[in-house]
Amino acid sequence: KFCEKPSGTWSGVCGNSGACKDQCIRLEGAKHGSCNYKLPAHRCICYYEC
């Protein structure tokens, strides 16, 4: 099971899930990452093991 947390290093709207994933894994120690719609825009969300 994964817990999601907004990226702490991504700024602005997320338009590239691949780049978001790489940044979550490389910079934040997450297992995965993707662009998800969170009001008011697409955000980079990182996924961690709960």
Curated annotation (Swiss-Prot):
Keywords on record: Antibiotic, Antimicrobial, Disulfide bond, Fungicide, Plant defense, Secreted
PTM comment text: Contains 4 disulfide bonds.
SUPFAM superfamilies, per the entry: Scorpion toxin-like
InterPro entries reported in the protein's UniProt record: Defensin_plant, Scorpion_toxin-like, Scorpion_toxin-like_sf
A GO BP entry: defense response to fungus
Disulfide bonds: C3-C50, C14-C35, C20-C44, C24-C46
Any one Pfam family match given in the protein's UniProt record, by short name: Gamma-thionin
Primary site of residence: secreted
Domain of life: Eukaryota
Gene Ontology CC: extracellular region
Database matches in PROSITE patterns: GAMMA_THIONIN (PS00940)
The keyword Disulfide bond is annotated on this UniProt entry: yes
Subcellular location: Secreted
Keyword Glycosyltransferase: no
Family: Belongs to the DEFL family.
Described purpose of this protein according to its UniProt entry: Antimicrobial peptide active against fungi, Gram-positive and Gram-negative bacteria. Inhibits growth of hyphae in the fungi A.niger (IC(50)=3.5 ug/ml), B.sorokiniana (IC(50)=1.8 ug/ml), F.oxysporum (IC(50)=5.3 ug/ml), F.graminearum (IC(50)=6.9 ug/ml), F.culmorum (IC(50)=6.9 ug/ml) and B.cinerea (IC(50)=13.7 ug/ml). Has no effect on spore germination. Destroys spores in germinated conidia by disruption of cell walls and membranes in A.niger and B.sorokiniana. Causes vacuolization of germinated macro- and microconidia in F.oxysporum, F.graminearum and F.culmorum.
Name of protein: Defensin D2
